[in-house]
């Protein structure tokens, strides 16, 4: 972490990032790519993150909660209205032991093969909105069971594919907190047999298929389904994640009806 504060006339967006880009020796072992999960520039109002230090070419992304459908963070009124730093969620929520363990287990991923040049690989660390939406979705499903409807809004370039991918993988491993909730087969059985990802464009379908397959650490659990026979085959063969397009959705419905 590179910590800055307004009382010394510095902030994370300019001074924190500038220090990482210009003043840090990226040949030091700790700062070399792959040694740290994430680097963050933090002040009392905003947080920025990167997973790869590359000198002046280092690219930072916001790790903020957003404020009134815009950038930044909302005012922190505190639990008793006493106020606090806008970025307190970072240490109060994200950096707890339970949260970090969850991030390492379910979110962080180094793509590519161990045979590939390390500098050509990509280290994925979730942005705040991705972390929040996947956790909220999984926790709500585990609490209230199947049959729920959700609306998740992502702006262009905000990582929809990764959010969908993380959600899909975690939903197939979601267990109900109670045997009494809808869809539960007992607290020792996953709540969902299969997750079906439906996209509205063929290009996005291809991107998602590649993204989901790349994230998979277990072979043969992901399958495309372009017609009902493929869906039937995928379900019968125990595929955990099935990907298709909205144009093929009527076939999906027919296939599910036939299986039931």
Which ranges hold each PLM region?
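ATP-dependent helicase/translocase motor core
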Residues: 2-194, 203, 207-218, 237, ...
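Short alpha-helical segments and helix-capping/turn motifs at coil-helix boundaries
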Residues: 21-27, 226-230, 254
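Short beta-strand-centered segment that lines the nucleotide-binding/catalytic pocket of NTP-utilizing
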Residues: 197-199
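Conserved helicase motor
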Residues: 202, 222-232, 246-251
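Conserved RecA-like ASCE ATPase "motif II neighborhood" in helicase/translocase motors
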Residues: 239-260
């Amino acid at each position: 972490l590179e910590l800055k504060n307004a009382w010394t006339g510095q902030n994370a967006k300019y001074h924190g990032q500038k220090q990482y880009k210009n003043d840090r020796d990226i040949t030091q072992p700790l700062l070399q790519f792959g040694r740290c999960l994430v680097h963050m520039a933090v002040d009392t109002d905003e947080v920025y993150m990167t997973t790869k230090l590359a000198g002046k070419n280092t690219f930072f992304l916001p790790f903020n909660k957003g404020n009134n459908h815009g950038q930044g963070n909302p005012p922190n009124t505190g639990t008793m209205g006493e106020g606090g730093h806008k970025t307190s969620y970072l240490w109060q929520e994200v950096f707890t032991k339970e949260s970090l363990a969850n991030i390492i287990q379910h979110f962080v991923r180094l793509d590519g093969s161990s045979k590939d040049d390390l500098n050509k690989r990509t280290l994925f660390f979730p942005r705040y909105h991705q972390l929040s939406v996947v956790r909220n979705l999984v926790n709500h499903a585990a609490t209230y069971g199947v049959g729920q409807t959700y609306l998740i809004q992502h702006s262009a370039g905000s990582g929809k594919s990764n959010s969908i991918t993380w959600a899909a993988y975690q939903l197939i491993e979601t267990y109900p907190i109670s045997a009494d909730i809808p869809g539960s087969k007992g607290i020792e059985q996953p709540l969902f047999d299969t997750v079906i990802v439906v996209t509205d464009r063929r290009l996005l379908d291809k991107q998602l298929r590649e993204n989901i397959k790349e994230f998979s650490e277990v072979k043969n659990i992901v399958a495309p389904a372009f017609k009902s026979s493929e869906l039937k085959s995928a379900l019968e063969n125990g595929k955990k994640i099935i990907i298709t397009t909205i144009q093929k959705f009527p076939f999906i419905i027919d296939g599910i009806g036939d299986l039931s």
